[in-house]
Amino acid sequence: MATERYNPRDAEPRWQQKWNEDKVFETDNADPREKYYVLEMFPYPSGRIHMGHVRNYAMGDVVARYKRARGYNVLHPMGWDAFGMPAENAAMERGVHPASWTYQNIASMKAQLKAMGLSLDWSREFATCDVEYYQHQQHLFLDFLEKGLVYRKQSKVNWDPVDNTVLANEQVIDGRGWRSGALVEQRELTQWFFKITDFSQDLLDALDTLDQWPEKVRLMQKNWIGRSEGLTVRWEIVPETAPAGETEITVYTTRPDTLFGASFLAIAADHPLAKDAAAKNVEIEAFCEECRRAGTSLAALETAEKKGLDTGIRVRHPLDPTWELPVYIANFVLMDYGTGAIFGCPSGDQRDLDFARKYGLPVVAVVMPSDGDAASFAVGDTAYDGDGVMINSRFLDGKTTEEAFNIVADRLSAASLGNTPVAERKVNFRLRDWGISRQRYWGCPIPVIHCDACGVVPVPKTDLPVKLPEDVTFDQPGNPLDRHPTWRHVTCPHCGKDARRETDTMDTFVDSSWYFTRFTAPWEAKPTDPEAANRWLPVDQYIGGIEHAILHLLYSRFFTRAMRETGHVAASEPFKGLFTQGMVVHETYSRKAGAGREWVAPADIRIEEIDGKRRALLLATGEEVAIGSIEKMSKSKKNVVDPDDIIASYGADTARFFVLSDSPPERDVIWSEAGVEGAHRFTQRLWRLISEAAGVLSTVAAAPASEGEALAISQAAHKTLKAVQNDYDKLWFNKAVARIYELVNALAAPLTKVAAGEGDIAYRAAVRDAAEILIQLVAPMTPHLAEECWATLGNTGLLARTGWPRFVEALVVENDVVLPVQINGKKRAELTISRDADQNAVTDAVLELDAVKNVLNGQAPKKIIVVPQRIVNIVV
């Protein structure tokens, strides 16, 4: 009888070495079995993994191990999203080269991930900063360029003067750079773009096919793509107010039905008319500059105070040339959406209403709800932006909004301004082409050359890779490639004259937009092996954070389509199933208050509870510190737990089991020492029960019982097996944990009985069968412990190579059935009764139900109709 405690410090490295030696998790592309590709979003090599990583990779590993046991050929690779600004910041702060900083971090994090016992195919590992990876990215860029999916243009960009780089709109917070905090400037730069807008409609339509994605993510992408059907309307400028050479303003609108409610036009600060006005007026120039400095993300625009300035320009209403409207420059109009000009209908749009009230502009209600009263309907502080019936709209009065839309569209399309229709129907998208140029060193070089004679010349594919030079310095801001004495100077591949390399590098989102494809054949001399890519793609289960719901996932969807168009893959969608897991959160602790507040790490405090009141005390001094809110683990608030500490104290299996057990996987998990200790106690209990009975169980073959004392044991095990199998299929890890706890409780007494030498052969065989099922159920979550238990029962093969158990159908059939009971066709109760009960037994049991007695009130029913195993209907 084994009595020693389970020692993860001994067992975990031993089993990891065994898996590694046997190459258990290396995947053969030629394996003919059905494929299953599971992938967690690969990490940025920051230097340390955190508990969020542990949860993410533990989830993926459960799926990989489970599917492997179910007989699939599983691909479960790992790599590193290794380019980006932090490496350059480290180079500037510490004088270390970005490459050495990055590869040191990769080595540290790889050791941490290996200690978790993840079933990863490390033979396919790469970092996106490996030349062997990014040379293929350069190849793809050139293929996209040939296909017309890449172009270069002058573009207004958000420029961070501290980081000396371009920022996406989403990276500008309250007019400042998200990383540096510097006031962002607007600059005109020549940028490289991917033509993601070529696929706008397809990217939108295909969302309907992604039925294994969270609805929330699909909705976020739908809104980001932002398809709208509307009208471009040309407004004639009143000649006396027109700037030289200007005769009209074109507006895009999705609500032409509300034109009679118009009270102003608004243009973006970068609209040509605004620029013209700014050149002549200092006040307008200052206002336009203020608009440019503000955040340009949708969230920033929605929350900012609505401001405008009258340009003095007036336009004629397209449906009534005697009606003139003012033209404002407004801070909520973007040049890169629609035409950079809108008409304001204050009664139908809250933003326009706020603006009109602020500047004393007319507010005319033109749409009311279908059941409204035209005589009394008015707009107060809230605009009415719904559909309904037209009012105060002349020939449109009484029409529905849909009818009015079409009447206006037809009328204005038939009318002319000059020799061109006043309006035309147009489908618009909010989605913009993807600007990939970044003015930094640590990224994939863009493989083009600039020649004064030939213009922009692609680097010949035979000359790839364009490697980053290693001899660079970071002693001043800006891009070291611009300052390099030799790297940028080359000869033109066309004419042989002196030329210059492109010094911009690619947005790091490019690196992560196709890495999942490279994993299918990372040794290939071309970007992909189409046969391997077509076999493995799409990824069956992709797991990562909701923060990547839009950009990374949308860019990956674009890239897969672009790679399809250029012959690299057959798939259109990269990820068949998507799961977005919650974060790992922790209490915060702090000393002092206000500006002098100091955050305290969980490792530096102890919690004591007296009379139901919790207190946090500093370990060093006993000083009480404040317990704050539960928040995402972050270094700034020190509420982090180091996975290395947990693994050293409790073992990897305990850490894995806890992050999977405590809450539904899509929700945040609250880290608690008590929860971790509970998970650790479970691993110890499981080992004790199995190891103490192992001496006896190893002498019998596993066999489920079909009768007698052991039948209940086999039923519990096989019912749990069926249920947990369903839980794993649906990624309900916490439900699986709850069922496993129940099964351990059910098997505790039988295992103890067997350990004491009791029970006949059939009983012991049933207990062994149940114990093996239990071990196989926990194996995806606690693989080291499971291997140890499996081996102690005398099994010789690796559990990691063992197939999934099969439940016996007869053991999982429920003996009871729940029958709805109706009285005169209305459901009044439910009856739980044996499935084998005859009609008389059902009738007798129904009449004993309190709900039935209350309705009958002592009367005998006319008739009782029993549909076996379906329903009971009483006729009164």
UniProtKB/Swiss-Prot annotation:
It comes from the Bacteria. Its EC number is 6.1.1.4. It is found in: Cytoplasm. Pfam families: Anticodon_1, tRNA-synt_1, tRNA-synt_1_2, tRNA-synt_1g. Its main location: cytoplasm. This is Leucine--tRNA ligase. InterPro entries: aa-tRNA-synth_I_CS, aa-tRNA-synth_Ia, Leu-tRNA-ligase, Leu_tRNA-synth_edit, M/V/L/I-tRNA-synth_anticd-bd, Methionyl/Leucyl_tRNA_Synth, Rossmann-like_a/b/a_fold, tRNAsynth_Ia_anticodon-bd. A motif ('HIGH' region) lies at residues 43-53. A motif ('KMSKS' region) lies at residues 632-636. GO terms for cellular component: cytosol. Belongs to the class-I aminoacyl-tRNA synthetase family. GO terms for biological process: leucyl-tRNA aminoacylation.
